[in-house]
Amino acid sequence: VHCKPRQIGDSTVGNAWNFSYGYRCLDPIRTLIMANDADATDSLFRCLKHFHDSLPSVLKRPLKRSNRKELEFADTGVIWRCLTAGGRGQGRAWTHQRLHADEVAFWPNDESVWASVTSTLHEGPHKQIFVTSTPNGPGGLYHRLVMQAMADPATCFRFFRWADHAAYRMRPPADWEPTQEEADLASLHGLDILQLYWRHQKIWGGQGI
């Protein structure tokens, strides 16, 4: 379970991990990739297809199918399927060994979708669930999964601070001064003035949240 800021490439990492696993696997495993909306589903499928298309010709496994948000190897029968949370079916007609649940905090009907997709998972040596999302406030499925992951030694939980990423910085005007609350946050979390102003703009700026 990963808790992350936006646009650090974590969804791509999850996609790459599942593609690498499926590429090396000789069993006909199926991986379900579930995104929060149609645009994200399209993006994840394009990323998956790019991994295959970018391989040297000598390393490319032959494809049986590469359409309808599905990628299937002809030789091993390995399949990746990309679906949108809340869409028709939720993959219930299939059995999967692996699940990449992306941006879970923004899934519509999150608990219902989660119950549906996890019921398709086959218990066995290939089973793995990879959950990644930007937080969306307390409560809901993703908050529950994070709290469970933090308490469960059998689950790998990773928290990625936005302040650890160089893109989240903005130079303030010369006359800008942080509020006392912002100064306290800077002291508590070790933020510099560029990070603090970036945060300020994201909350109070014209293009912020």
Model-assigned labels for residue ranges:
Residues 1-209:
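Phosphate/NTP-binding elements of NTP-utilizing enzymes
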